[in-house]
Amino acid sequence: MAILIPASFGRLTITSRAQVRVRVSASANQRTIRRDSVDWVKETSSFFEEDKRPIMLFDGVCNLCNGGVKFVRDHDRNRSIRFEALQSEAGKKLLLRSGRAPDDISSVVLVENDRSYIKSEAVLKIMKYIDLPFPQLAFFLQFAPLFVRDFLYENVANNRYAMFGRSDSCEL
């Protein structure tokens, strides 16, 4: 008999009850570790106390990402987005707040006071904050299926250094 675990556990096929017990207890231990760890929302709440603007986390050594930051700054007349490199201490803390590993530089992240967005969702959310016509473009792009948007995003993100190069340090 095979038991299929839900997708959130990574589609494992389990062939015996002993394996099920091991998996459940391992999962329970992970929850305990998370509960006892630092509350990163509280730890980073100071980032949003005086300034409620969202923070765009980006790869500080990626030329494509630096170009994206420059583009957003040029098209954000209201200065509604703040920027932080993923490699900075503040960036690492905000990654932890978002439920991501502190060394994960695989995606742009948009951190709002109560929510975080990654990959194509982050890009669309950023587009909603900047000047016309980008909010309207984001509205239409949101109807493309998430798996298609993220597939395209991941293909560019995984090849960004090869296509656009990298710099020695963050330009901001």
Swiss-Prot record:
Q: Does the keyword Cell division apply?
A: no
Q: Which GO terms describe its molecular function?
A: protein-disulfide reductase activity
Would you tell me the Gene Ontology cellular component terms? Answer: plastoglobule
Note whether Plastid occurs among the keywords. Answer: yes
Q: Which UniProt keywords apply?
A: Chloroplast, Plastid, Transit peptide
Q: Which residues, if any, are the signal sequence?
A: none
Q: What family does the Swiss-Prot or TrEMBL record give for this protein?
A: Belongs to the DCC thiol-disulfide oxidoreductase family.
Q: What is this protein called?
A: DCC family protein At1g52590, chloroplastic
Annotated organism of origin: Arabidopsis thaliana
